[in-house]
């Protein structure tokens, strides 16, 4: 059966002809050598060019990263080797290396050595610690030396491929080859070593259109790979997968199974001839260099093939090798921090006859199934003995140890615990995936169908695109994960049982009430598992979360891609593994999970009994869970964080509790928030206290002015002046009728023009004094403008009704500060909207008229016109209303509807 490996294109960049490619070991970079003479670095994550080096005008046939030095080394047709620092782009070294075209450069993995091969038929060894001195020359080939590569298992040896139709293996320090492999009928273009530990192989590609796999210990050809229609120009063994890649001038890259040598896939991206292949150990990415650009592909998923049983024993596969570790070997004395790599001793368990693509313990942990290459093998977990095998594209366990295999899209077989076939199902649709658990599930790209294990009867069809399925141990809850979200459903097994036992018919949709949707959460799951009624998962944003009752809590932020292994209740820790098989653990208290589960079930008595066993530092997390369930009172009782308790108290309207927290915290923001809440609920005494604590002068101004509290306004005036809040102080003075203080405040604030305009409207007698100050101040900036200012003492003709305004001011000044009762507002509001000067001039001043009240309302004081002559030179007497009330701030001249805060332009001249 073929390997089921997804191949995804990760980068496609068009360029000049690419002669070699290399991958950086730590950065997301591809190094491409171009026939045009340039070397480019591409970032395959951002799909952009990072750097470009103009090396020469002739082709650059090979370049490599030297990551430990931050260098790149390049060999070109001008016979020079050049070394660049890829960070600074400085040229580190340039030297003539050969007498003909340089075909290849290879970097030693640990030593300061670089090998170069050339059309001069020589191989040279260069030592950069010795100033790039040539320390050795290897002679023996009789034609161009096309490629050299170090043996990763024995870095003291290397192989060379030549157009003399041979491959030679050399040792550093010896001028003669160790041996020669001769088998191709035409020149050999490329060579690569097998990186795995079990086979001493190398592969060669030739102009005879074949690739050959050699055993360099027996010096024999193991396999010849035929199928290309042109010269084979690039070959490699994939470092992580059981595949061999060959690239040809026919424009294709062929993928061969490394064990069976079966052709698995053929890739053709339409970029003409293939010249180079690049890979990196530990990665599934492969780079291909073409005539017209560079392609990067990713083969398969980088998910570690591993499984953990309920006791903490982990089994994983590295290639065909099976290894095991046991978390219990870490004693209680070793305190491992959350997220820290566990120091586990790896034990070799055995090997597998097929390449594992999935590995899973059965529910009781006795058996482990390995599935891959279209087959499955069931092993014993302890001794790794083969118990059963067969054909399968997929394998799943039931909760009681039975299992099912998907042989094809149209056939699923169910087996008993004794490994005997019990039932065969032919679904009426194309089954692309199957899932195990309480029910056997089969799905297409559009829907999933659940079947019972006993008879294979359909239980329910759900229309959703399923990527994974997770059953809770209780069998009552199941998570369906899709591309963008996941759904938590309740399985009503009693409803299903009664329906089936009663002989009820099952339609195309199954039993209608079999499942009940509880929650939908818009997160993409990477891996997940159930612990009780708690669903633990890590998402695409590298967060480790858990979900209880639809409430999602983030446990930790992961620093890399991790995959869940399982949860050990006796340690209260959840374990994860990365693709390098590093195991880490994170604490997740079982008591916390149990508490939340009991709350969701409505068992509050047992939940409260469990609460003391939860550490105090976790109580806020418990409170947030209760808040999410609408249980604010209970959350307030449990919460410990003062900020959080304050927020809860405010939500509940528990002002006394919030006040106690605010007193303890002495937080200005808390006092302000509490003051606003108290004001909105009518608790004005508390509001005043809170606003005073918060020093919220604007809030106090609103409160005192609304209450008509003159004493409060007086107190607020002092506070505002002390804090430099002149706007608040001005309004307080104005409402109190202290117009002289208003003017003085404007003058002190250097707002002299505004002071002049205000005095013209409210205190005409102060105008000459302020105009003098204004002239003096303006003289410093614009003397001409200062001279243009008119003083009413000198030019009374420029100020309309000036004398009347002075007389009215003198009459009403002693009456300021006397306030009418609030109950008379309606009477005052109905008075004519007319200034005193206008009233005098129109001779319609009546006793009932009143002046504006102390707080600046648009009402008028009563003025009587008894005995007033028409002459403006005569004294004007303005009487007050019978109740003695006057306005605190009298608009003597001008329209009161045009009052401004500190300014009024009515009838003032300059």
UniProtKB/Swiss-Prot annotation:
InterPro entries: Beta-prop_COPA/B_2nd, Coatomer_complex_subunit, COPB2, G-protein_beta_WD-40_rep, Haem_d1_sf, TPR_COPA_B, WD40/YVTN_repeat-like_dom_sf, WD40_repeat_dom_sf. GO terms for cellular component: COPI vesicle coat; Golgi membrane. Gene3D superfamilies: 1.25.40.470, YVTN repeat-like/Quinoprotein amine dehydrogenase. Disulfide bonds: none annotated. The keyword Cytoplasm applies. GO terms for molecular function: structural molecule activity. It holds the Pfam family WD40. Coiled coil: none annotated. Residues 882-910 are annotated as: Disordered. It is found in: Cytoplasm; Golgi apparatus membrane; Cytoplasmic vesicle, COPI-coated vesicle membrane. Keywords: Cytoplasm, Cytoplasmic vesicle, ER-Golgi transport, Golgi apparatus, Membrane, Protein transport, Repeat, Transport, WD repeat. CDD domains: Coatomer_WDAD_beta-like, WD40. WD repeats lie at residues 13-52, 55-94, 97-136, 140-180, 183-224, 227-266, 269-309, 351-393, 461-501. It comes from the Eukaryota. It is a peripheral membrane protein. One of its GO terms (biological process) is endoplasmic reticulum to Golgi vesicle-mediated transport. The keyword Protein transport applies. Residues 900-910 have a biased composition (Polar residues). Oligomeric complex that consists of at least the alpha, beta, beta', gamma, delta, epsilon and zeta subunits. The coatomer is a cytosolic protein complex that binds to dilysine motifs and reversibly associates with Golgi non-clathrin-coated vesicles, which further mediate biosynthetic protein transport from the ER, via the Golgi up to the trans Golgi network. Coatomer complex is required for budding from Golgi membranes, and is essential for the retrograde Golgi-to-ER transport of dilysine-tagged proteins. Belongs to the WD repeat COPB2 family. PANTHER family: COATOMER, COATOMER SUBUNIT BETA'-2. This is Coatomer subunit beta'-2.
